[in-house]
């Protein structure tokens, strides 16, 4: 008798995606982050749903409703901090997932890669709007500064900003629409995730060697299901530790002050996971130039497949490219640090140097070093 999981119309899809899926036998722990991102998304949607039951998106009551959740709702403090720190875990997993793709050449699956870039933008937009909702000082001023960047767009910029604000400044209309979009976007992200997986399963997974693994495949279950479960336990332990011991470690103390349009905080900065892009934005003195650099800092991922000059897919056997990759990681850490510092000497010049290096490594040095490696291997 044929197993029901192979014949039932719905179970058949689940079976071919998570049970009988042929997977390369050599996948390392770097391949765990896709499933971890799925868990993060699930945690964020669930905690967000319960928070939305008690939150009010009105400038007069938003800050107090968050206080009410933390003080009066059963385990409301836990929901709030799981949601806030869950976003941090989400971005840690996201950046490691993208880094894995860059290192092992997974970007050669261009459809999967491009949907991934769309996902990155969607998650960043969701996180930005979520940061505005508690209506603290950094929420208000962060929203003001970032939405104002759109005014750099020639001709339509000012109208566009006022259209997004729903008035002449960040106010009640802005908060209400940001809440609506913050609620909606995670479901769009979920749909995009399904498309991402659909394209991935068309080609099959890459592996650390970058060599086709068709002759050596193993079923996803039980080998990788058990491996993923271990990953879940490690990540959820890290999240629980963060939430229960130092929930405000990654937040900004200014956000515990209710939003006040008449008082600007000394240093306006976004959450830590946007600091690298914020540093690139600030390192260019021209407003439009800064906005273009900000967008390009993420959009540059879309042209990485075109810049792939190596005859080998993965960096596993390319020591020169590995050195450049880890230099890029160091540059990103430097940019993240600079994004949180005030705009003064020597931070300005460090930020500008790191920004130039970031684009230089991806656009010129990596393709050039790949050609050098090809030559050294006489390919």
UniProtKB/Swiss-Prot annotation:
Coiled coil: none annotated. Binds 2 heme b groups non-covalently. Keywords: Electron transport, Heme, Iron, Membrane, Metal-binding, Mitochondrion, Mitochondrion inner membrane, Respiratory chain, Transmembrane, Transmembrane helix, Transport, Ubiquinone. GO terms for cellular component: mitochondrial inner membrane; respiratory chain complex III. It holds the Pfam family Cytochrom_B_C. The keyword Zinc does not apply. GO terms for molecular function: metal ion binding; ubiquinol-cytochrome-c reductase activity. A ubiquinone binds at residue 201. Heme b b566 binds at residues 97, 196. The chain crosses the membrane at residues 33-53, 77-98, 113-133, 178-198, 226-246, 288-308, 320-340, 347-367. It is a multi-pass membrane protein. Its cofactor is heme b. Heme b b562 binds at residues 83, 182. The keyword NADP does not apply. Its main location: mitochondrion. It is found in: Mitochondrion inner membrane. GO terms for biological process: mitochondrial electron transport, ubiquinol to cytochrome c. Component of the ubiquinol-cytochrome c reductase complex (complex III or cytochrome b-c1 complex) that is part of the mitochondrial respiratory chain. The b-c1 complex mediates electron transfer from ubiquinol to cytochrome c. Contributes to the generation of a proton gradient across the mitochondrial membrane that is then used for ATP synthesis. The cytochrome bc1 complex contains 11 subunits: 3 respiratory subunits (MT-CYB, CYC1 and UQCRFS1), 2 core proteins (UQCRC1 and UQCRC2) and 6 low-molecular weight proteins (UQCRH/QCR6, UQCRB/QCR7, UQCRQ/QCR8, UQCR10/QCR9, UQCR11/QCR10 and a cleavage product of UQCRFS1). This cytochrome bc1 complex then forms a dimer. Belongs to the cytochrome b family. Heme 1 (or BL or b562) is low-potential and absorbs at about 562 nm, and heme 2 (or BH or b566) is high-potential and absorbs at about 566 nm. This is Cytochrome b. The gene is MT-CYB.
